[in-house]
Amino acid sequence: MGKSGLYFSLICFYTLFPSSFGNPSRCTLFIGASSYHSDPCGSNHPRCTWRLDLFSLTKDQSLSPPCPGLVTYSQYHKPYSLYVFPHWIAKPDRRGLGYYSASYSDPCAIQCPYLGCQSWTCPYTGPVSNPHWKYTSDLNFTQEVSSISLHLHFSKCGSSFSFLLDAPGYDPVWLLSSQATQIPPTPAPLIQDSDLQHILEPSIPWSSKILNLILLALKSTNYSCMVCVDRSSLSSWHVLYDPLKAPSSPDPQAQSILRPSLAIPASNITPPFPWTHCYRPPLQAISSENCNNSVILPPFSLSPIPDVSRPRKRRAVPIAIWLVSALAAGTGIAGGVTGSLSLASSKSLLREVDQDIDHLTRAIVKNHDNILRVAQYAAQNRRGLDLLFWEQGGLCKAIQEQCCFLNISNTHVSVLQERPPLEKRVITGWGLNWDLGLSQWAREALQTGITLLALFLLLIVVGPCVIRQLQTLPSRLQHRSQPYSLLNYETNL
């Protein structure tokens, strides 16, 4: 009885929680517009491993740098060693070979520690004591000239960290963020992600590549579908293929590389790039043959464009709707005229307030430029002092104090400058000057007269229609009360 109960419990547990066993996961690094997947890792196998190329990381980050206005001081060179900084954790301790212990708690921002970065890229969080990272178990890496073998514990996947150089300067060379992802259910391709040059080549911007793919997909559907591109992940694949170029006889040694979730036939079109893969419609898979009749697309969805050109049937509108519409129109016109005149009376006041805001904004921008110029002088002196104390490890290490950096942001002032004038944001009238230099009682009398005139014109327009409908109402009611003719009882049936 005990064994049967144990077996029954195990069967129920595996049935209710199938995702905790045998569901492969991994950790994905994001830099710029590119992503790098680790080896399969999870709770059972918590060590996530990457083999990264430093030159590829540099190209990927140059497309989307973390700090657009970053002042670059140090440049990557092969003999330089690397430091790794997980963000917002305990202060690092050097452990030889150019490595830092994976813990940091400095109140200074290290994500973009130099001048030129904006406030949203360098958030100030203050000293943070948790979570605590251990260098050997949570994060470690080995550097071999231009390549890095990175090892990260799966529990720390979801954080961000930077790679710095053992060289003068403070700018991060690479800023990476991580996120836990699931391995797609389709079999992994035999070729690496970097070999799909028509999708992941870092030298070509993502936007131009996506536009070409959207144009090609629209041509294949004769512009009858809307294309929605999903660039969040490449876990599912779509294929665009030419059915006229399908291989006639299958190769017995060919293997299926991947099975796309969507295959779109496109014949008699000229793609913006050559076909790069071989798709077999009977197998519904990309094979290792060299027929070159298809191209792999990022995930997107096709939906038919709604037809809005259908004719509408006209129906007679009852008299009650005419009356309600007339009353509503009269009330709306009166309210609109009154509201426009009321807003126009405060136009001069808004203009004066807008001028005061403009003067204050100019003064703040001028003070910001002066502070930024002083900060640049201080940064220049800091570089020179670091070169003088280079043998002691830099200025901060020589004086045994924390290295702080000045982060000056002008985001709020720029947003204030880009906003339209206060008069355009508040007044939504007809653009006419209703002030006319009149007193308050004269403006109120003018408003009342315009309202009465609008109601009188509305009565002239709608009144004849209402009277005509009321005159014909008795005859319509009489015809409706006698739908059948009376029988003449004097006639012989």
Curated annotation (Swiss-Prot):
Residues 344-390, 400-432 form a coiled coil. Keywords: Cleavage on pair of basic residues, Coiled coil, Disulfide bond, Fusion of virus membrane with host cell membrane, Fusion of virus membrane with host membrane, Glycoprotein, Host cell membrane, Host membrane, Host-virus interaction, Lipoprotein, Membrane, Palmitate, Signal, Transmembrane, Transmembrane helix, Viral attachment to host cell, Viral envelope protein, Viral penetration into host cytoplasm, Virion, Virus entry into host cell. A motif (CXXC) lies at residues 225-228. Specific enzymatic cleavages in vivo yield mature proteins. Envelope glycoproteins are synthesized as an inactive precursor that is N-glycosylated and processed likely by host cell furin or by a furin-like protease in the Golgi to yield the mature SU and TM proteins. The cleavage site between SU and TM requires the minimal sequence [KR]-X-[KR]-R. GO terms for cellular component: host cell plasma membrane; membrane; viral envelope; virion membrane. A motif (CX6CC) lies at residues 396-404. GO terms for biological process: fusion of virus membrane with host plasma membrane; symbiont entry into host cell; virion attachment to host cell. Residues 316-336 are annotated as: Fusion peptide. The record marks R315, A316 as: Cleavage. Residues 379-395 are annotated as: Immunosuppression. Residues 1-22 form the signal peptide. A lipid is attached at C465 (S-palmitoyl cysteine). Pfam families: TLV_coat (PF00429). InterPro entries: TLV/ENV_coat_polyprotein (IPR018154). The mature envelope protein (Env) consists of a trimer of SU-TM heterodimers attached by a labile interchain disulfide bond. PANTHER family: ERVV2 PROTEIN, VIRAL ENVELOPE PROTEIN. This is Envelope glycoprotein gp63. The gene is env.
